Regions:
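Lectin-like carbohydrate-binding module/patch detector with strong preference for beta-trefoil
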Residues: 1-168
Length: 168
């Protein structure tokens, strides 16, 4: 089977390789204290990168867990649910993987995981160069679906497969 999945924005925006949820910093040297971003998906290189790889089983439990760093995604605080932080897992299911392909905050379902509309920033590597955008929780809105609709991807026998959030 597969252990790691990536969560990819359905719309590729300005990078045909697409954008995935990513820990800031480079792969194994990612810095959890710097938090999350949307970054060119590394899967075009033939595997899911460790700083984009979420635990498939924990995701089924609605937990966004990065096993290689032993951290989960949590809202920074309930006063400031718009920003996200990476901390030791609290075993709390903070997110809803919704039918409409959004990732919503369980305690405030009006908030969706959202990629910034601003132009992408260029990263330090990749060919063509990797792109990055900010990631935050914003009010869910159909008009912003290109920035708020996600899909789960994984490799099986060397091929990449897609799965709807709600089917996962």
């Amino acid at each position: 089977e597969f252990d790691l999945v990536e969560i990819k924005l359905i719309n590729n925006l300005d990078d045909k390789r697409g954008f995935c949820i990513d820990i800031k910093g480079h792969k194994s040297r990612a810095k959890i204290e710097r938090g999350l971003q949307a970054h060119t998906c590394y899967s075009y290189q033939g595997e899911i990168a460790i700083d984009q790889g979420l635990d498939a089983d924990r995701l089924k439990q609605k937990e966004l867990f990065f096993p290689n760093f032993n951290v989960c995604v949590h809202p920074s605080s309930y006063n400031n649910p718009l920003s996200l932080t990476l901390i030791k897992c609290k075993n709390t299911k903070e997110f809803i993987l919704d039918e409409d392909n959004t990732i919503r905050l369980k305690n405030n379902t009006n908030l969706c995981l959202t990629v910034a509309k601003e132009e992408s920033r260029k990263g330090g590597g990749g060919s063509p160069v990797h792109l990055m955008r900010n990631l935050s929780m914003q009010i869910c809105n159909n008009k912003h679906s290109v920035y708020q609709n996600w899909v789960i991807r994984y490799f099986k026998k060397g091929k990449i497969f897609k799965e709807k959030l709600s089917k996962f």
